[in-house]
């Protein structure tokens, strides 16, 4: 997700999206461990999206 897209979400939507991405990251890591993951770059994309959401949430808290 782009930061612009994240900023358009409400706080509840951001928290929900973060939860979904964490679940996806868990599944991707599981697939990587079992040798089923084809697109390993997706792990990096998901991690960066989680970080972007956390950054925007932190900015809004201040």
From Swiss-Prot:
TM region positions: none
Entry keywords, A to Z: Ribonucleoprotein, Ribosomal protein
Example of a GO MF term: structural constituent of ribosome
Pfam families documented for this protein: Ribosomal_L29
SUPFAM superfamilies: Ribosomal protein L29 (L29p)
GO terms classed as biological process: translation
GO cellular component: cytosolic large ribosomal subunit
Source domain of life: Bacteria
InterPro entries in the record: Ribosomal_protein_uL29, Ribosomal_uL29, Ribosomal_uL29_CS, Ribosomal_uL29_sf
Keyword Ribosomal protein recorded: yes
Entry annotated with the keyword Cell inner membrane: no
PANTHER family: 60S RIBOSOMAL PROTEIN L35/50S RIBOSOMAL PROTEIN L29, LARGE RIBOSOMAL SUBUNIT PROTEIN UL29C
HAMAP family in alphabetical order: Ribosomal_uL29
Name the UniProt record assigns to this protein: Large ribosomal subunit protein uL29
Organism of this sequence: Enterococcus faecalis (strain ATCC 700802 / V583)
Lineage, broadest ranks: Bacteria, Bacillati, Bacillota, Bacilli, Lactobacillales
Gene: rpmC
């Amino acid at each position: 997700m782009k930061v612009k897209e994240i900023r358009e979400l409400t706080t509840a939507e951001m928290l929900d999206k973060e939860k979904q991405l964490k679940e996806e990251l868990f599944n991707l890591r599981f697939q990587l461990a079992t040798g089923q993951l084809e697109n390993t770059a997706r792990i990096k994309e998901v991690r960066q999206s989680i970080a972007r959401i956390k950054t925007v949430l932190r900015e809004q808290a201040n």
